[in-house]
């Protein structure tokens, strides 16, 4: 059953930041939103040319610079680096510093899939696993590295709720703030799923786009006769604070959640009811 819960105290969203194919700065993102052209590119994945939406050139440069900024960062998955860059931008906008105590909950659905696939392929080939294979591919990898990068001393949580991961991070952040156990929380999600195995999984589900039209992703076309999903990559985070803040971009005044009774292993019904 869905639950709608009024908040006893308003939560302020004091900053939002993202890294995606649309860019990583507000002006660039808005300009690309207004561009009628897509951000799709063709990559050879899962043994064939595949449309995907990778990061824009500027974001890739910033990610590369971040990767080179610390010797430990060279071994991290892109999903971690995307979240780290977005988190840096968010707390800068919110005015948070290392003196602030804030929690972190940034999750991921696919997790460190690119790095995991590389490590698994090496194991299949050599029969040996690298020392860093486990610590760099665990689910807790994202929030813990963000905490390290931002020198945060608050609680850090990682989780995966399939397609609702980032929204559940907001729910978790609100719960922590309402409980009085934190005054500030950094929440969001990160995905870097443009890999052979991930694309193969989406094709096995029959949901990946096979269209060669000008707009191959028909997300708003309710009359389409086939699935047209195209994977992208990126991270989005926001800064939450308890109470009404003067610098708030928006306020959270209510939250909700629901649990679905599954009819099928891949969470679909016979008539595709939502």
What annotation goes with each model-predicted range?
Residues 13, 37-160, 193-198:
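Conserved beta-ketoacyl condensing-enzyme motif
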Residues 10-13, 101-105, 182-187, 219, ...:
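Short glycine-aspartate micro-motif
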Residues 19, 108-111, 161-165, 189-194, ...:
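Acidic, glycine-rich active-site loops and adjacent beta-strand->loop/helix elements
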Residues 27-31, 117-129, 146, 176-179, ...:
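A glycine- and small-aliphatic-rich helix-loop capping segment at beta-alpha/alpha-beta transitions
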Residues 83-93, 139-142, 147-150, 155-191, ...:
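Active-site-proximal alpha-helical scaffold in enzymes
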Residues 5-16, 26-27, 31-50, 213-274:
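Condensing-enzyme catalytic core mediating Claisen C-C bond formation in acyl metabolism
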Residues 22-24:
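Cytochrome P450 core scaffold surrounding the K-helix E-X-X-R motif
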Residues 67-85, 130-138, 157-168, 219-236, ...:
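Active-site pocket-shaping loop/turn-to-helix segments
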């Amino acid at each position: 059953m869905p639950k709608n819960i009024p908040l006893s105290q308003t939560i302020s969203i004091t900053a939002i930041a993202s890294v995606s194919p649309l860019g990583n700065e507000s002006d660039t993102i808005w300009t690309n939103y207004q561009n009628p052209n897509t951000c799709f590119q063709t990559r050879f994945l899962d043994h064939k040319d595949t449309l995907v939406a990778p990061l824009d050139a500027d974001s890739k440069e910033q990610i590369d610079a971040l990767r080179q900024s610390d010797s430990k960062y060279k071994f991290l998955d892109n999903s971690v680096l995307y979240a780290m860059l977005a988190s840096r931008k968010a707390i800068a906008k919110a005015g948070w510093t290392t003196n602030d105590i804030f929690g972190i909950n940034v999750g991921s659905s696919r997790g460190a899939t690119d790095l995991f696939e590389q490590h698994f392929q090496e194991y299949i080939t050599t029969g040996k696993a690298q020392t860093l294979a486990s610590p760099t591919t665990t689910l807790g990898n994202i929030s813990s590295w963000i905490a390290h990068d931002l020198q945060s001393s608050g609680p850090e949580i990682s989780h995966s709720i399939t397609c609702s991961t980032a929204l559940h991070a907001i729910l978790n952040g609100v719960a922590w703030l309402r409980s009085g156990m934190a005054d500030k929380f950094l929440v969001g999600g990160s995905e870097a799923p443009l890999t052979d195995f991930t694309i193969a999984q989406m094709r096995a589900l029959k949901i990946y786009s096979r269209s060669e039209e000008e707009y191959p992703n028909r997300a708003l076309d309710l009359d389409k006769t086939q699935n047209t999903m195209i994977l992208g990559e990126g991270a989005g985070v926001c800064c939450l604070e308890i109470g009404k803040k003067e610098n708030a971009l928006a306020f959270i005044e209510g939250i909700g959640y629901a649990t679905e009774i599954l009819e099928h292993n891949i969470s679909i019904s016979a008539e595709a009811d939502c």
